[in-house]
Every structure is written in structure tokens, then in C-alpha cells.
Amino acid sequence: MLERIKDSFTESIQTKIDAAEALPESIAKAAEMMVQCLLGGNKILACGNGGSAGDAQHFSAELLNRYEIERPPLPAIALSTDTSTITAIANDYSYDEIFSKQILALGQPGDILLAISTSGNSGNVIKAMEAALSRDMTIVALTGKDGGAMAGLLSVGDVEIRVPSNVTARIQEVHLLVIHCLCDNIDRTLFPQDEQQ
């Protein structure tokens, strides 16, 4: 059991090393897109299932409240938090539409969708991306494995941040780190701080 625990740490470290080589450019591009979105008076919508729903909520909380510096709140909405809306849509229509219907109601041109799926194949996240495209929103896709069907929906103006791993737990661990990198870049760009602090 102890060896298995150590192996989990080692795998996680190696996945982060691989991600540190593969992902910085796409993370920086996504952060810059988010900064421009926010400067333009727009908002970021985020969605995912299970642990990815938790990541969407984590990202939105960091923007709405604060990350590491005191600053004004920034507009971000996690689409996985309203159980009445989610269960109504799932019951009356389909679970695949729980995010897309919210995007059709809330999304505006210039907004960004942060679409999170470790496999890239979550049906409701794919539908969310399709709805975002119909609203002239930009997409930042946080994926893993081979990018799945989500990768095929992205255009030149969108960004995929694909974790170089096939292990769901390792992908989720890097997704959280990516979210923190995005928040850090957004904060430091919008609210430059003295590096001594």
C-alpha cells in the first residue's frame, strides 16, 4: 500500500513535468483571451461533470472572490451549481442539455466558455461548446487523453489545453494547476503587483 501511494505521487510529479513542457503557451494564450474578455466587459462561463464540475466551480470562485491578491470581483459563472435548473433541464429535455440551455440564455458574443472534460467526450460539455459557438463565444477547452470530440469543435480563435496523460486522476490534478495558472495570469495582468509582495 505504501508503495502504491508513493507511485501515485511519482506519476503525478511526472505528469506535471510533462505538462510544464507541453502547456505553457496554450495556458498563456488562454489567460490573455480571458483578460481581453474581462476588459471588454464580458464574462467567463465554466462547465464540467463530477470532478470537472468542481474545477469549474473552483475557477469561478477564484475569479468572483479572489485568488492570491486583493482585487475587485471578476465575472465568472459555473454552470454546475444551480440544482433546480440542472434537474429541470435534465428531466424535461436531456442531461446533455444542462449546460447548453444555460449558455443560450446567458452567453453573449465576447464571452468565454471554459469547457472541462478529462476525456474530451462529455456529451453535455460538447453541447455546451456548440451553444457557445452559436452565441459567438470563444472556447477554452481543458482536456486530456487524445482531446476527444471536443478537440474537433475548436477553431483557430479557440484554445485547447490538453494534459499529456491518459490517466483521469493525473489529468484532474493538472487541470487544477492549470486553473491556478490561469487565475494567477489574469490577476497579474489586470492588477500588476510589486514582485516584492
Swiss-Prot record:
GO CC terms in record = cytoplasm; DnaA-DiaA complex
> Pathway membership of this protein?
Carbohydrate biosynthesis; D-glycero-D-manno-heptose 7-phosphate biosynthesis; D-glycero-alpha-D-manno-heptose 7-phosphate and D-glycero-beta-D-manno-heptose 7-phosphate from sedoheptulose 7-phosphate: step 1/1
Single GO MF annotation: zinc ion binding
Q: Which CDD domains match?
A: SIS_GmhA (cd05006)
What note does UniProt attach to the cofactor annotation? Binds 1 zinc ion per subunit.
What's its job? Catalyzes the isomerization of sedoheptulose 7-phosphate in D-glycero-D-manno-heptose 7-phosphate.
**What other note does the entry give for this protein?**
The reaction produces a racemic mixture of D-glycero-alpha-D-manno-heptose 7-phosphate and D-glycero-beta-D-manno-heptose 7-phosphate.
Protein name per UniProt: Phosphoheptose isomerase
The gene that this protein is the product of is gmhA
